Amino acid sequence: VSLRDTLAYLLDDWLQSSQLCQRDRHAEHSRETFEAVLDICDRLAREKYAPYNRLVDQQEPRFDGERVILPQATHEAHQAYVATGMLAAAQTQEWGGMQLPFTIESAANVLLGCASVSISAHMLTVANANLLLAHGSPKQQEVFARHEFSGRWAGTMCLSEPQAGSSLSDISTRAEPDGQDFEADPLGPRYRLHGHKMWISNGDHELTDNIVHLVLAKIPGPDGSLTPGVRGISLFIVPKHCVDAEGHITGRNDVALAGLNHKCGWRGTVNTL
């Protein structure tokens, strides 16, 4: 039994996903449109992902001191994935989406992940943009999330630090107000971050024009010290390239790549320090 057949059984016979079409958000869909999406991703997985899974594992990302270099196959797979519109598949039409049920979007991404986890790591961008839709300001959503859903920009989550690992309460990255007018920026209060992040998947590459890092950091108290534990932690939007209020790139930000980590598995995924 193929993975495609297994997904069909799970979606149709067990979950009865076509019943979701009775909801207003998914009213334009049917079992046929669900199958069409799965067929597209199945073909993409077989043609652009699976044949190059071993290649990207052998030709690991490398840093030449200025940029991260990836195999051409990774670039082509990413471009093909963006062309399907799957980055915004579950979003409303307002965000360029298909208004697919999340269940169908997830099933389609399973096909790609099984073909090559390394190449399909760009799905992290969707999670980044979804967080901005849930917690970002309207301007932040328009400037950052929209570009991520279109595939022009990518996204990451930056939690781990060299001295803390993934122990959230032990992070020490600081975020200090940037000038007297730091609250006047139309994209939100502006801070300068000082610290180191480690093991960041897709932390740097040339697949997209920009990378939107969501960085966990602490704002110092009045005495300049950091609050122990998880209290005082905030989340900051830190783009690789600075942008203006209209989303135009204005120059390089102070995000510095120190190097790449060697991975035991999924070696085709960029993992940064």
Walk through the language-model features, giving the residues of each.
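C-terminal structured domain segments across diverse proteins
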Residues: 133, 158-159, 169, 187-188, ...
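Internal maturation/activation junctions in enzymes
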Residues: 61, 124-125, 136-183
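A short core secondary-structure module
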Residues: 188-248, 252
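Amphipathic, small/basic residue-rich leader segments at the start of a protein or domain
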Residues: 1-119, 139, 143
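Flexible, small-/acidic-enriched active-site or ligand-binding loops
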Residues: 244-273
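Short Gly/Pro-enriched turn/cap motifs at secondary-structure boundaries
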Residues: 163-166, 204-206, 227, 262-270
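FAD-binding core of FAD-dependent oxidoreductases
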Residues: 91, 96-99, 103-106, 115-132, ...
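Structured core elements
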Residues: 80, 88-90, 156-158, 172-176, ...
